[in-house]
Swiss-Prot record:
Localization: Cytoplasm, Nucleoid
SUPFAM superfamilies registered for this protein in UniProt: AbrB/MazE/MraZ-like
HAMAP family: MraZ
InterPro entries: MraZ, MraZ_C, MraZ_dom, MraZ_N, MraZ_sf, SpoVT-AbrB_dom, SpoVT-AbrB_sf
Keyword Protein transport listed: no
Subunit record text: Forms oligomers.
Domain SpoVT-AbrB, residue spans: 5-52, 81-124
Main subcellular location: cytoplasm
GO cellular component, one term: cytoplasm
Organism: Histophilus somni (strain 129Pt)
Similarity remark: Belongs to the MraZ family.
GO biological process: negative regulation of DNA-templated transcription initiation
Record gene name: mraZ
Molecular functions (GO terms): DNA-binding transcription factor activity; transcription cis-regulatory region binding
Identification of the protein by name: Transcriptional regulator MraZ
Amino acid sequence: MFRGASAVNLDSKGRIAIPTRYRPEILEINQGQMVCTVDIRQSCLLLYPLNQWEIIEQKLSKLSNFNPEERSLQRVMLGYATECELDSAGRILISAPLRQHAKLEKSIMLVGQLNKFEIWSESEWQAQIEKDMTLGASGQFAMSEALSMLSL
């Protein structure tokens, strides 16, 4: 399970270091294999351990190629999906198209989301968090049925 936000740096070759606390799980369960793709709604990337990505792939494969929205989701998520592997220093390489999509520069935020990470440029992350906090504080947060049942 991945949780918390970590500030990491993108090196000149397009690599980021996965925080040490997550490496054993990724190595033990997935032999260091991960998949990175785009988030279709926000300018961040989604980084999955291989076993979690395979669950997403199964769900995507069940969508209809004849439904334009479903086909679009398949095209983008699968089209950008890039396999990556932790190297001996615990780094992964993020491809140039993925870096461009998420506007990644040197300062990156790696944000745990239980079964995956979100990868944000630091400036985009700060803007998104500010937006999320403002929305929550304003009381204009649209409650889905699942959210209305959630007790924290």
